[in-house]
Amino acid sequence: MKTGNQFNTVALVGRSNTPGIAEPLTTLAGCIAKLGFEVVFEVDTAREIGISGYPALTPAEIGARADVAVVLGGDGTMLGIGRQLAPYKTPLIGINHGRLGFITDIAAADMQARVPVILSGKFEREERSLLEARIVRDGEPIYHALAFNDVVVNRSGFSGMVELRASVDGRFMYNQRSDGLIVATPTGSTAYALSSAGPILHPQLQGIVLVPIAPHALSNRPIVLPDDSKIAIQIVGGRDVNVNFDMQSFTALELNDTIEVRRSKHTVPFLHPVGYSYYATLRKKLHWNEHASNEDDTAS
């Protein structure tokens, strides 16, 4: 926990194309402004909700000017703005206005009570890791991207299995026939990787998990690697193969293309309310321990 006012400018970012989001964002902006903070809006958010009276900034301008960003939306909104603000080390406060909300941990109904407390300097800070990836074709890099959750190489449409050659730190691991391969951060271990039978990695664990998607050989199991590993995935066989970054952007691949993945030098700071518990999040979102007991951790 940290105390002491260290924020002056607060950026507000909202989930796009979301009916009903204008009112809570406008209310929150007024609440924060009354406390003496400068409030700015992400430019697309300001345009969508039609708000005026506050500066409308691009993500790069937010990174240069704002001390913290409050994100009202779902996990996808956090992933998108998190990647863009990572180079600026802008801390994020997540308010859940989506469905699952693994990384937006403040309920929308509680935001007017909880956000001012965090902005006053009372919070728990957590650094989340990112992946950086590049696609190499004919020996030349043709595309770069950051991923907060995962880098996913997979087949598309009705095409058959793909064959992938995976290497770690220049050492051959395996050739794999499957529907694809997920490279996930600890944050991403509760996303697509989890639905493909991957393990849950605590966010503070320094690791990267490789998770096959519907492998032809059942002996191809997920593996957790050190987070300084350099992973290379080559397209050996198959057609209509794509690589996705947080399932929000993708590019088509060709035979012999290689996707190189490693941990990014950037991290994304999350600011949680005091008393935040990752285990409480798992219980709530994954419906663990449905029958409460006296031994339950009551932290939210």
Curated annotation (Swiss-Prot):
Main location (coarse class): cytoplasm
Organism lineage: Bacteria, Pseudomonadati, Pseudomonadota, Betaproteobacteria, Burkholderiales
GO cellular component, one term: cytoplasm
EC number: 2.7.1.23
Regions crossing the membrane: none
Source organism per UniProt: Burkholderia ambifaria (strain MC40-6)
Compartments where located: Cytoplasm
Keywords in alphabetical order: ATP-binding, Cytoplasm, Kinase, NAD, NADP, Nucleotide-binding, Transferase
Cited Pfam families: NAD_kinase (PF01513), NAD_kinase_C (PF20143)
Name of the protein described by the UniProt record: NAD kinase
